[in-house]
Amino acid sequence: MAITAQMVKELRESTGAGMMDAKKALTETDGDMEAAVDWLRTKGLAKAAKKAGRTAAEGLVGVAVSGGTGVAVEVNSETDFVAKNADFQTMVTGFTQAALSVDDVEALKAADMGGKTVETTLQETIAVIGENMTLRRMAKISGDSVAAYVHNAAADGLGKIGVLVAVKGADNGIAKQIAMHIAATSPMALSEADLDPTLVERERAVQTQKALEENAASAKPKPDSVIENNIIPGRMKKFLEENTLLGQKFVINPDVTVAEAAKQAGVEILGFVRMAVGEGIEKEKEDFAAEVAKTLAG
């Protein structure tokens, strides 16, 4: 398979690898982007990406809590200028409040909002502002108590990253602190049991290959039993601790894990939602010359 400059650019942007390393990785894996990432990681040339794709879309995430229920809603726009528009922000706030009464995004589109459906309100706002918008997704969570946090807030309950944390037990403020922690660390899952088994096995394969190659290149190679019983399990333990909420060191007090902090506060974390604007979306771009030509032609 021919390796293009665009493929090299994409791999470099997703891994931080150098140009020649990225090109070699793609060549070695016949252009398979996912395999190329793993190849770079076995060579110690790239870190694991927590989420595929770059965040390039604009818009806002809205969060709302009512009793023991919390919701997060993402609405995308074409430009950040519209995301700062008061009418757009009011609309997203309305959608978020409406989401408290439904369970999925399709039901939300059909939900009533001031005598009109959410979908109708969206289309009318598009017509007024003159820019395309999308009600992309919603998430709902419940518990004895739910805390919400918005990072980079544009207005009350609106921002680029929205987090919800549901807990069992009387919340004394720890849930809000954990929500702030989640915004900063972006854990993949609540616990090891919640991680995608395919992801875990892929990580194990990467760490196994990396350990074997490092050992083969060592002046004093270790026995295979040490690799299998000590080194690989140790690396997997670190991976799980770094990527599961309960296993992470608590940002506010790194001497304890999040699980320990919750236990000390007398609560059990039931689940969380972390929603970032444009997660997994890559906005189509035009080069500057094409953009100027398009403007002049218009």
Swiss-Prot record:
Chief place of localization: cytoplasm
Highest taxon of the lineage: Bacteria
GO CC terms in record: cytoplasm
Entries under Pfam families matching the protein: EF_TS (PF00889)
Stated family: Belongs to the EF-Ts family.
Gene assigned in the entry: tsf
Molecular function terms from GO: translation elongation factor activity
Function: Associates with the EF-Tu.GDP complex and induces the exchange of GDP to GTP. It remains bound to the aminoacyl-tRNA.EF-Tu.GTP complex up to the GTP hydrolysis stage on the ribosome.
TM region(s), chain numbering: none
HAMAP family linked to this entry: EF_Ts (MF_00050)
Subcellular location: Cytoplasm
InterPro entries, alphabetized: EF-Ts_dimer_sf (IPR036402), Transl_elong_EFTs/EF1B (IPR001816), Transl_elong_EFTs/EF1B_dimer (IPR014039), Transl_elong_Ts_CS (IPR018101), UBA-like_sf (IPR009060)
Signal peptide residue numbers: none
Keywords: Cytoplasm, Elongation factor, Protein biosynthesis
Protein name per Swiss-Prot or TrEMBL: Elongation factor Ts
Region (Involved in Mg(2+) ion dislocation from EF-Tu): 79-82
